[in-house]
């Protein structure tokens, strides 16, 4: 029988809907529970639930316990706005989420109007914190940082390569692709192809034929793992030998399941992996013992709750605007990501992006390893 991870938090979620007397602070977790990006939603949910249990076990925030309500945005902007409006109607004070930048940005505007503070573990589009809103925070980096790292890496390691920049037409995917392209162009490298494809597309044979005809030997992908896995697999099937490089949208072991052995050697940017921090060993073991691998955004979500709880304590208040002020002024906060401070926009002051390579481990499984 599979163990329940951090049991007791699920009870809090149920109680929240029932108007419990003890659950004084309601936190919404806005994520894709269903749809192609549900794996990332699960990471954010598990991380937030585990951290909230830790906070509640220690007495809550300023003497008040935290309850949870979960909203499924299905990675769709319109549904994200519906979730945001439901959270506002339910009296949510703080939101952990959303994942997709295209959902997070419009939802943040609803939250700002309703006095709700939002911390996203995964929205990397710069526009999110460039809106001038009081309530926007993230524990991840930004695509203008990530694209700069990717562009420089490609320039340094693939000189004279013919480069294709491909994206999924979303605020995240196209935004990241454009930032990478911008850096390459600044360095004097012109891409051979720049193409957009549709989210949910399954057959990339026409795209791959175009890549082969152009003699492309480096493919940069701005998008998420479902399409990336298919492109990688179909490139191999159609005999295109090109280096595939992407960003933090492919950091899921599902990528290897979709791409198969062709995933070997794939490169992607992401922040330093907090699972490798010895200070997090006990927590990581706890997740694994419960049958959940805390990869990618799990600990970024955990850190979001830690930041929120410590900022509320520093503010001496659970009022979202007071907590937002404390998050910008009272850091650094002790988190699983390290000592975490936020600037005036709500962006984290964290180490930059690093490069990972997908390799086959001794257990026969593929995983992304920091280079």
Swiss-Prot record:
Which UniProt key words apply to this protein?
Amino-acid transport, Signal, Transport
Q: Name one GO biological process term.
A: amino acid transport
**Its job:** Component of an amino-acid transport system.
| Signal peptide as annotated in the record | 1-23
Q: Does the keyword Signal apply?
A: yes
Origin species: Brucella suis biovar 1 (strain 1330)
- Name of the protein in question: Leu/Ile/Val-binding protein homolog 1
Which protein family is named in the record?
A: Belongs to the leucine-binding protein family.
The organism's superkingdom is given as Bacteria
